[in-house]
Amino acid sequence: MVWFGGCTPRADLLPDAAALAGDVIVPVYVGTTRAQEAEGAWAAKIAGPLTYARVDVNVPKEGKPGIVALPDANPDPDRHFLTHSVTPLAGRALASGKIRGNEVVVTIHGFNNTMGEGVFRTAKMIRDFDIEALTLHYAWPSRGAPLGYAADRDAALIARDGLEQMLQDIRLAGARKIVLVAHSMGAQLTMEVLRQMVLREDLATFSRISAVVLLSPDISPALFRAQAEAIGDLPDPFVIFTSQNDPALRLSAR
């Protein structure tokens, strides 16, 4: 698991000048159905077409495993996660390009997440586990609000087509193996997309899913059984991790 440390503001993706002095820059590719606002930020409430971007993230050298430290009034690249740069990628850039290597890792965030939080968690995971495979983050339009559970649940369902399209783009770009890592409500979204691909007979994409990891999945046992029955043979390996201390699940249970 990757948690945010301290009582800090919510993460955003506004480039920070302090990041220019950082030594460790981790690139995270992002596919999102969040609509971009006029000033360039991604909206929390509006679902738009799937777009791509590359976010270069400053990862602090002094960071603890599993902890994302956000900046305070004095951002320090040695202690804080900072946005170094954001580069929009034109159109369906993945489908028209080529992916180095055979394997791609896709992370899917859960309930109550800003876009920055999902990207920073992904950068932390890449750094902690020394992931060499190309890693993408799917950012669906969570409201990023503790009391926005119902709205997030609807947004996750609306985001199914965007995630399926992103997986199709990854396949078309040459990936032979796709590993899905989903947290909380993102796990339900992931299961829904696997089910949707099977029902739509998109076996060309489904067959590329080589592994699934669900972290503290926010799915009832009855719903999971129904999804799994519709999917049939689940990708192998298929791993589920649970945690009694997951803050997203504690909020959803209220």
Positions of the model-derived regions?
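Cap/lid segment of the alpha/beta-hydrolase catalytic domain
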Residues: A139-D154
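Structural cue for short, hydrophobic secondary-structure segments
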Residues: T107-G110, H137, V181
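Alpha/beta-hydrolase active-site loop
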Residues: A150-L172
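Short glycine-enriched nucleophile-adjacent loop
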Residues: A187-L199
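Gly/Ala-rich beta-loop-alpha elbow adjacent to hydrolase catalytic centers
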Residues: L163, A182-G186, T190
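Flexible, membrane-associating and regulatory peripheral segments of lipid-active enzymes
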Residues: W3-V105, N112-I131
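The feature captures the conserved acid-bearing segment of alpha/beta-hydrolase catalytic domains
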Residues: S216-R254
